[in-house]
Amino acid sequence: MTSAPLIAFTDVSKSFDGGAVKAVDDVSLDVAEGEFLAIVGGSGSGKTTLLRLANRLIEADSGSITVEGEDISSIDPIGLRRRIGYVFQSGGLFPHISVAGNIGITPKLLGTPEAEISARVDELLDLVRLDRAQYRDRLPHELSGGQRQRVGVARALAARPRIVLMDEPFGALDPLTRDALGDDFRELHRSLGLTTVMITHDMTEAILLADRVAVMRSGRLLAQGTPAELSKSDDAYVGELLRTPRRQAKRLGALLPRDGAP
């Protein structure tokens, strides 16, 4: 018997400018418990709008969204957001609050005792590979981009959510930092048993990190599946997205010698 999805979008639509712009157009999409789903698309595809609908940062015009089996329209929006981790592209840290304060903010709002928050902050700093003594009391402007993003991930995990939503989490980072952070979060996803939905415009990143990829364009869901399943899609846009990493891999293979080769 198939278990119910942890997140389910059913016939969801969202428009802006009085209906002139249909950002999400009749999208149905399920996310299974423990799955890492990447939603890929260009600017204006509706991918970020869909993510923001999941924790009621904005409200759908029609359709239904369930999280952990509950219709989110019946859940207090603030309470919903506090039980879902959210990672922003730039980290989204409060600039005048220390690293420890940023990480512990959701548990504090939930009324967690200070001693427990402090222990949780230390645990999370270890988890995201930031030295406690060195980074705990720093302000965000004293961190590199990669360090800020690691703090953002720690903050998203602070209240022990089952679900983490990530909006272009690695897009503003240099390639080496981006690669390392992606690998580290994938391991956190596995070891903590998370359900992750990541927004990205980069199909290569989606293929490398996610279990399954959904492709959006102009508010519509064009295709979804594993990379192997997507390769069988007859949609021209999906095919072009998949050809890009193939072309890049082929060019790199031609330009770079193999390890150990002269």
Language-model segments: which ranges?
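Conserved ABC ATPase "signature" C-loop
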Residues: 218-219
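ABC ATPase "signature
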Residues: 224-225
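Conserved catalytic motifs of ABC-family nucleotide-binding domains
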Residues: 160
